[in-house]
């Protein structure tokens, strides 16, 4: 190509895109769907009966390269059971000022308690507001779930929870109501027996 055509070739890209319709995003009003597998805000999941999946093992905190996760485990008791195992995550914090969204914490979780949602709007005017505590990370309770602490489902073990056998809360059978006692019907006098 001759040297004097160089500037014209350079402006060729500009001229070809100058008359195209721009792809404008009206972001706050119209939100585009995220791609499948998008790494957004974390979520602590629950079992179908409402118990937490987190067992407080701290593997997610060890796997985090940015040191953004802090977990304190505590022991479950028979009076207060938050997860089906021996332990649960009493304190769970994720610092989104440090989180890089890599997902290594999700891969390290042995009970699939930690997942990443598609939620990406995590802005705050306060730095402390970007340190998410356990109450902001827990999945919301569904209508058929019971808020912990509560006992394991009757007739189940910890292994049933870990194997995924606890899928839905069984409908509570209504206790059989005894029929109200009916007063004995009054007998009509029998003329043959009353002789």
Curated annotation (Swiss-Prot):
Which keywords accompany this UniProt record? 4Fe-4S, Cell membrane, Iron, Iron-sulfur, Membrane, Metal-binding, NAD, Quinone, Repeat, Translocase, Ubiquinone
Major enzyme class: translocase
Domain annotation 4Fe-4S ferredoxin-type: ranges: 44-74, 90-119
Q: Does the keyword 4Fe-4S apply?
A: yes
Where is this protein found? Answer: Cell membrane
List of residues binding [4Fe-4S] cluster 1: 54, 57, 60, 109
Names of required cofactors: [4Fe-4S] cluster
Source taxon at top rank: Bacteria
Q: Provide the membrane topology annotation.
A: Peripheral membrane protein
Q: Where is the composition biased (Low complexity)?
A: 168-181
- EC number(s) recorded for this UniProt protein: 7.1.1.-
Q: Which residues form the signal peptide?
A: none
Region called Disordered, residue ranges? 145-195
One of the GO BP terms on file:
aerobic respiration
- Residues the record lists as binding [4Fe-4S] cluster 2: 64, 99, 102, 105
- Predominant location: membrane
A single GO cellular-component term from the record reads: plasma membrane
Q: What does the record note about the cofactor?
A: Binds 2 [4Fe-4S] clusters per subunit.
Stated role: NDH-1 shuttles electrons from NADH, via FMN and iron-sulfur (Fe-S) centers, to quinones in the respiratory chain. The immediate electron acceptor for the enzyme in this species is believed to be ubiquinone. Couples the redox reaction to proton translocation (for every two electrons transferred, four hydrogen ions are translocated across the cytoplasmic membrane), and thus conserves the redox energy in a proton gradient.
Name the chain's protein: NADH-quinone oxidoreductase subunit I
**Organism this protein belongs to:** Rhodococcus erythropolis (strain PR4 / NBRC 100887)
The gene is nuoI
């Amino acid at each position: 190509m001759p040297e004097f055509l160089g500037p014209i070739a350079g402006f060729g890209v500009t001229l070809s895109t100058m008359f195209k319709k721009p792809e404008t995003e009206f972001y706050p009003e119209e939100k585009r769907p995220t791609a499948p597998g998008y790494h957004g805000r974390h979520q602590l999941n629950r079992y179908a009966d409402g118990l937490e999946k987190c067992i407080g093992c701290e593997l997610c905190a060890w796997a985090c390269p940015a040191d953004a996760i802090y977990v304190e485990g505590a022991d479950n008791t028979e009076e207060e059971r938050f997860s089906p195992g021996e332990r649960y995550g009493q304190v769970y914090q994720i610092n989104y000022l440090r989180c890089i969204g890599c997902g290594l914490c999700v891969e390290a979780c042995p009970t699939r308690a930690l997942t990443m949602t598609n939620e990406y709007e995590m802005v705050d005017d306060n730095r402390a507001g970007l340190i998410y505590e356990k109450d902001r990370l827990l999945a919301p309770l569904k209508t058929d779930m019971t808020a912990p602490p509560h006992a394991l489902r009757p007739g189940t073990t910890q292994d049933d929870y870990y194997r995924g056998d606890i899928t839905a809360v069984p409908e509570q059978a209504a206790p059989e109501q005894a029929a109200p006692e009916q007063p004995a019907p009054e007998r009509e006098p029998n003329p043959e027996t009353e002789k």
